[in-house]
């Protein structure tokens, strides 16, 4: 990993999982960032190119380090941005030791996403012992929080499902076009959303030729969606047999007395997201494959006169815009770099 003067120095702590390796891929193409450290405790001592051959051309000699306190202190010395690809409770504990020592901490876990520490025992099963730092964390969705992100020291990257649902629904709630209760979000995700570690419910013979709903009534992304959309909703996620992608189909009622058509909904979304580099408002139904490998989210909307429902559909790559790409986009804003650096809105096809 060669370093260039004036480039931002990057560390990824917890780099051996899918979000970590996606970050490494994106940073390899970033014109103003250099990766100087990548830890992965379960893979410490393993060559990155051995575990992920797709990165061999850019990181031929890089080896995953470990994150014990002494070693980590050396690895993050002088770092401009540290991405945390760790379990929620690990990020909860580590973030306070990094904030103020590195320019910006970007956490890809849920440890600092919710507004209230009191919500964590119910939705995540642990007590949040950093309520003051939680208040300082900035939610990492630039399309809705761009100004707050400028100069942020701690960024909480949104959940993948949350990004898909929020970008579909938040504009219509904010514009007063749909009711802020009774919303339904049905979303389907590829298997990479479950992470790299093999489990019974994500091995090939389990997911192949299958589709199932999970997290019924209590998926942990629910409160995050409600906070960011500003509405009460029912969320049901589904696992589908593809590697990457999320398709969210959302249903809502129009505000009483409003005059809504399909075209007025699409026009409202286009106006809300005007000049957003990664938002594509389409007349056609979005597809996950069109977003593969990109930081784009594709959105469309319909009004059904027969039932009186508004339907909004969004598609994105769960590992890119839904995780690592969104994290890099937020980091760019926080560090004062061009927001699109290292990212593309063009998917890989076919």
Stretches found by the model and what they are:
Residues 9-12, 156, 249-251, 312-315:
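Short glycine-rich or small-residue beta-strand-to-loop segments that form or flank ligand, phosphate
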Residues 18, 136, 160-167, 216-224, ...:
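Conserved active-site and cofactor/substrate-binding residues in soluble primary-metabolism enzymes
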Residues 22, 26, 167, 171, ...:
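Alpha-helical scaffold segments in soluble metabolic enzymes
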Residues 151, 246-248, 308-310:
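Short amphipathic alpha-helical segments
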Residues 202-294:
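Contiguous C-terminal substrate-recognition/catalytic subdomains in enzyme active sites
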């Amino acid at each position: 990993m060669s370093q260039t003067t004036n480039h931002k120095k990057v560390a990824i702590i917890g780099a051996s999982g899918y979000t970590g390796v996606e970050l490494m891929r994106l940073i390899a193409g970033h014109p103003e960032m250099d990766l100087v450290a990548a830890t992965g405790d379960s893979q410490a001592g393993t060559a990155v190119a051995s575990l992920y051959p797709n990165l061999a051309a850019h990181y031929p000699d890089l080896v995953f380090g470990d994150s014990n306190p002494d070693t980590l202190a050396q690895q993050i010395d002088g770092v401009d941005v540290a991405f945390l690809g760790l379990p929620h409770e690990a990020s909860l504990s580590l973030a306070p030791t990094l904030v103020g020592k590195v320019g910006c901490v970007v956490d890809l876990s849920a440890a600092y996403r919710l507004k209230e520490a009191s919500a964590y025992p119910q939705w995540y099963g642990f007590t949040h012992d950093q309520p003051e730092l939680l208040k300082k964390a900035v939610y990492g969705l630039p399309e809705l929080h761009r100004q707050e992100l400028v100069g942020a020291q701690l960024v909480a990257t949104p959940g993948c499902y949350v990004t898909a649902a929020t970008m579909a629904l938040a504009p219509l709630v904010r514009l007063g076009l749909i009711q802020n209760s009774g919303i339904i979000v049905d979303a389907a995700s590829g298997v990479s959303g479950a992470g790299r570690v093999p489990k019974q419910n994500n091995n090939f013979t389990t997911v192949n030729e299958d589709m199932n709903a999970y997290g019924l009534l209590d998926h942990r992304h629910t409160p995050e969606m409600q906070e960011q959309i500003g509405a009460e909703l029912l969320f049901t996620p589904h696992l589908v047999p593809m590697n990457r992608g999320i398709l969210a189909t959302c249903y809502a009622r129009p505000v009483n007395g409003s005059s809504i058509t399909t075209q007025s909904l699409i026009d409202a979304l286009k106006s809300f997201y005007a000049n957003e580099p990664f938002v594509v408002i389409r007349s056609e139904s979005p597809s996950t494959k069109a977003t593969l490998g990109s930081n784009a989210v594709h959105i469309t909307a319909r009004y059904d006169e027969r039932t009186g429902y508004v339907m909004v559909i969004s598609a994105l790559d769960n590992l890119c815009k839904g995780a690592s790409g969104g994290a890099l986009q937020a980091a760019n804003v926080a560090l004062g770099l061009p927001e699109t650096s290292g990212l593309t809105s063009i998917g890989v096809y076919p």
